[in-house]
Curated annotation (Swiss-Prot):
Family: Belongs to the endothelin/sarafotoxin family.
Localization per Swiss-Prot or TrEMBL: Secreted
InterPro entries xrefs: Endothelin_toxin_CS, Endothln-like_toxin
Protein name: Sarafotoxin-i2
A biological process term (GO) from this entry: vasoconstriction
Organism: Atractaspis irregularis
Gene Ontology CC: extracellular region
Length: 118
C-alpha cells in the first residue's frame, strides 16, 4: 500500500514536468533530476562504490565498482567459513531449515522428560 502513494507522486511530478515544458526540449538538469528520482547523491554515496587501496605506495589507487570483488579477493586471505549451526545430522529438519535461513541454531543435548498423565 505504501507503493501506491509513491507512484502517484511520481506520476504527478512527471505530469507537472511535461506541462511545464509544453513541447520544449527538457533542460539537462531537469532530465538528471527525473532520472535520479529528485534526489542528489552526496559525495559519501558516490564514494561508497569505490575502494581505495594504499598497498603499493603512498598514492591511493581507486578501484571501480566492477572490480570490487576482484580487489576484495586479492586483499583478503583465504579462510574457511565458520559454520553457523551445530546440526547433529542432516535428518534434523528444523535445524537445517534455520541454517538455510542464516539463523544461528544451537542444539542442546537435553534428555526428553517422560509425559506424565494424571
Amino acid at each position: 500500500m505504501a507503493l501506491l502513494p509513491r507512484l502517484a507522486a511520481g506520476g504527478l511530478l512527471l505530469l507537472m514536468a511535461l506541462a511545464a515544458l509544453d513541447g520544449k526540449p527538457a533542460p539537462p538538469k531537469l532530465l538528471q533530476k527525473l532520472m535520479d528520482g529528485g534526489q542528489r547523491r552526496s559525495e559519501d554515496q558516490a564514494a561508497a562504490g569505490r575502494i581505495i587501496d594504499y598497498e603499493d605506495g603512498d598514492e591511493p589507487v581507486a578501484v571501480s565498482v566492477g572490480d570490487t570483488k576482484q580487489a576484495a579477493r586479492a586483499l583478503s586471505p583465504l579462510r574457511k567459513p565458520q559454520p553457523l549451526c551445530s546440526c547433529a545430522d542432516m535428518s534434523d529438519l528444523e535445524c537445517m531449515n534455520f541454517c538455510r535461513l542464516d539463523v544461528m541454531w544451537v542444539n542442546r543435548n537435553r534428555k526428553p522428560s517422560p509425559i506424565q498423565s494424571s
